[in-house]
A protein has these predicted regions:
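Conserved N-terminal structural module of periplasmic/extracytoplasmic solute-binding proteins
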Residues: 1-81, 88, 275-277, 298-299, ...
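Extracytoplasmic/periplasmic substrate-binding proteins
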Residues: 19, 38, 80, 182-186, ...
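Periplasmic-binding protein-like
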Residues: 29, 130, 305-327
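Short helix-initiation/N-cap motifs at beta->coil->alpha
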Residues: 50-59, 78, 146-151, 230-242
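Hinge/lid segment of periplasmic solute-binding proteins
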Residues: 75-125, 180-183, 187, 268-270, ...
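Glycine-centered hinge/linker elements that transmit conformational signals in sensory
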Residues: 153-158, 198-231
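Long, aromatic- and glycine/proline-rich binding clefts that accommodate carbohydrate-like moieties
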Residues: 318-371, 402-406
Length: 406
């Protein structure tokens, strides 16, 4: 069914597009849910088309231009406001009993209306070797009491002095695309800066280039300049798994592999650092939506509601290591719940998740912030780089009339 298109759909057929290319664990879950829905609704058929993630957003934009969007589609949380603003998506009419039970970071609101919901979310954390912390005499921070900046800096210095490791920490700068804004903007926000004025969504001036933002950029650059972190770590977090570094900043989806490698007791799952304005991590992951052009909106919405049942949220979690977006599903999962291996990842997300700003301009903000941070790590002047980033973001907002609803 991967080559089926919207054009050939028969009556009673709903088309569904997903970023989970065929053969992946997530695809298998979606297929199971679709088959169950088809069985429960004779006369209705969900027809799945799967895309590789890399080209998925482009496929949606192209289909929208040709008026060939599917009935049901998944989307990465931060892109939703742009697609809602562009008229691709229908508002979702879901029962309050469902939406009230969901974590906030899995609900996609734009201009006060709900457009997408996600079966899961995940979180960021520091993973560290317990033995290294013991050798360096470092106290372990807790979710209730995360590191301060001074404590974190002191811990990095001590870890860097251990003879067994090349660097103190892998900050995962090998990763690309949405990773840099997702992973490092929360640190900027903890310093007191931001990537845009969240209240008005009309400017980045004073937020991305104020004194707090400059302090963040200077500190971030120093990690690499002072030799605490590598500018060229191995891809995919291999430095930590190979014992080259005692700590890595990573997504919750990296925890199981680390526990398999070193044993669960040796792997500390640590919260983000409180740089002054509270600890923060990125929130929001893949979510489901209905296209505005769908002639089967009601059935499409029913499918999304069907997919959000606890049993399926458990299935998603067990397949891909994310946590369910509804608390009642958590005890049924392999990895989440009291005493289970990924429980701290959920607690960190619940305590500290900050959504990326819900503006149609986020796509541009994301790429501008990504470039600015890369330049800063490479040694560019922090203030000048951030001033230029603000100019670029504000110019885009102006060029789109402030992204007001059309």
């Amino acid at each position: 069914s991967a080559c089926s298109s919207q054009g050939g759909s028969r009556p009673g057929t709903l088309t569904l597009w997903t970023h989970s290319a065929g053969g992946t664990d997530e695809y298998a879950v979606i297929e199971t849910i679709a088959n169950d829905f088809n069985a429960a609704n004779p006369g209705t058929k969900i027809q799945i088309t799967a895309f590789p993630q890399a080209g998925y957003n482009d496929s949606i934009v192209t289909a929208a231009a040709a008026h060939e969007l599917p009935d049901i589609l998944d989307l990465d949380g931060p892109i939703m406001p742009n697609w809602a603003w562009s008229g691709y998506l229908a508002q979702l009419d879901l029962p309050a009993s469902l939406t009230d039970a969901m974590v906030d970071s899995a609900k996609g609101y734009f201009n006060g209306a709900l457009y997408s919901v996600g079966p899961y979310d995940t979180s960021l954390c520091f993973l560290a070797r317990r033995s290294a912390f013991q050798a360096a005499g470092i106290a372990v921070p807790t979710i209730a009491r995360p590191w301060t900046r001074d404590e974190f800096d002191a811990a990095l210095k001590r870890l860097s002095e251990l003879p067994d490791y090349e660097f103190a920490v892998d900050m995962s700068v090998w990763d690309t695309a949405e990773w840099w804004p997702y992973a490092y903007a929360p640190m900027l926000q903890s310093f007191g800066g931001d990537i845009i004025d969240r209240d008005t969504l009309t400017t980045a001036d004073g937020f991305l280039n104020g004194s707090d933002a400059v302090a963040f950029g200077t500190w971030f650059r120093s990690l690499f300049a002072d030799g605490l972190a590598s500018q060229t770590p191995g891809t995919d977090g291999t430095d930590f798994l190979q014992g080259k570094v005692p700590m890595v900043y990573a997504g919750g989806w990296k925890v199981l592999k680390a526990q398999e490698t070193f044993g669960a007791d040796e792997v500390l799952i640590l919260p983000p650092v409180d740089f002054g304005r509270g600890a923060k991590v990125g929130g929001g992951s893949w979510q489901w939506a209905v296209s505005a052009s769908s002639k089967n909106r009601e059935t499409a919405t029913r499918f999304i509601e069907f997919l959000m049942q606890d049993d399926y949220l458990v299935m998603y979690s067990d397949a891909i290591g994310t946590y369910p977006s509804i608390e009642s599903a958590i005890p049924g999962t392999e990895n989440y719940g009291a005493g289970k291996p990924l429980e701290p990842v959920y607690e960190i997300g619940k305590a500290y998740a900050l959504l990326r700003p819900a503006t149609p301009g986020y796509k541009v903000i994301s790429s501008v912030v990504d470039k600015a941070l890369h330049d800063i790590v490479s040694g560019a002047d922090v203030r000048k780089t951030l001033d230029q980033a603000v100019k670029d973001i504000d110019a885009d907002i102006r060029a789109n009339d402030g992204y007001r609803p059309e």
